[in-house]
Design a protein with these regions (language model features):
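Active-site microenvironments in enzyme catalytic cores
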Residues: 3-216, 220, 308-316
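Generic structural signal for buried aliphatic residues
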Residues: 140, 252-253, 275
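Glycine-rich active-site loops that engage anionic ligands at enzyme catalytic sites
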Residues: 177, 197, 220-247
């Protein structure tokens, strides 16, 4: 057994000592190249000592290296400061029956997500009592490393920490119903969002060539690539920062890849299904689908009796 803070006294060379690494993700994002280098060296130290049969522990005697099967992964940032989800894939919009307006090519448009309902890998996707059509969305997004305001695209690129998978879970029937008022979404989205399983840092990301796929119970339902987007990561962040402060640890989802949801396929997940979203280099975000919640007596509005089922409009 070897304590990390006692390595020097145990004769570890400089190359064998674990450097200080931020103990939470937003601080790690903000540590930049120095933090990334420290993290890589810490991993190298852990591998070296493991090969020698040393058990690394912290100052309190707790192990610092664990088997994957012995831990439960949370969302990379369980409660980001802010989450925005953009529409940047034309195939998703047209696949859902929308006609693209000039605004789509002029600027990236988003809605703000509920940061209090984010779940991580393996956690259950909540099925609200008020929907009969639960849906997944196959997305990729990025975290900001440092804050900024009025960033140029060139500057914005240096403020991006890395990417992860984002499942923008949707209650499609009520979402379409409420957005018929040209506002929202609200109850159609606010109940649950999944992200993970890890953050792939930008030094390993080619943002235009990430291959993505969605499987339900092991069956391939959808696939696509990030090259189909309208805007780059930096363009999205630059636009968001115009006359507005952006903070470290914010999350920017880039929207659903074309064909990357049940709504476009007219195919619907069911309670007990396992939804797996995969992105090359990032891994697989896997979540079970929960059972439909029972609506408590008197809860909600008596004027709402459920939305009609929705089906995507198909182009001839």
């Amino acid at each position: 057994m070897l304590r990390v803070d006692e390595q020097l006294r145990n004769g570890a060379t400089a190359a064998e000592r674990a450097p200080a690494v931020a103990d939470e993700m937003v601080a790690f994002f903000g540590s930049g190249e120095a933090g990334l280098g420290n993290a890589q060296r810490a991993l190298d130290v852990a591998r070296t000592h493991r090969e020698r049969g040393n058990r690394l522990v912290d100052g309190d005697g707790n192990p610092v290296v664990h088997e994957v099967g012995d831990v439960r992964l949370l969302a990379p940032v369980p409660r980001p400061r802010r989450v925005r989800d953009y529409l940047t894939y034309p195939g998703h919009a047209t696949g859902g029956g929308l006609k693209l307006s000039p605004a789509f090519e002029a600027m990236p448009i988003c809605y703000k997500c509920n940061i209090e309902t984010i779940v991580g890998p393996g956690e259950t996707l909540l099925w609200p009592s008020y929907t009969d059509q639960l849906d997944f969305e196959l997305e990729l997004g990025f975290f900001t490393s440092t804050g900024g305001r009025n960033l140029t695209p060139g500057e914005a690129q240096r403020h991006i920490a890395g990417v992860t998978i984002f499942n923008d879970v949707s209650a499609r029937d009520i979402q379409v119903f409420e957005m018929s008022l040209t506002i929202g979404p609200s109850k159609g989205k606010d109940f649950c969002t999944a992200m993970g399983p890890c953050v792939l840092t930008m030094d390993e990301v080619d943002e235009w060539s990430v291959e993505m796929s969605a499987r339900v119970n092991g069956e391939l339902w959808a696939s696509g690539t990030t090259k189909e987007r309208q805007f780059s990561f930096a363009e999205v962040l630059s636009w968001a920062s115009l006359d507005e402060d952006v903070y470290p640890g914010e999350f920017f989802a880039l929207g659903t890849v074309g064909g990357g949801c049940g709504y476009e396929l007219d195919r619907w997940i069911q309670p007990g299904d396992i939804v797996e979203l995969e992105a090359s280099g990032v891994g697989v975000l896997s979540n079970p689908v929960g059972t439909k919640q029972i609506r408590p007596d008197g809860a909600g509005l008596a004027t709402y009796h459920g939305s009609p089922e929705v089906h995507p409009a198909r182009s001839e």
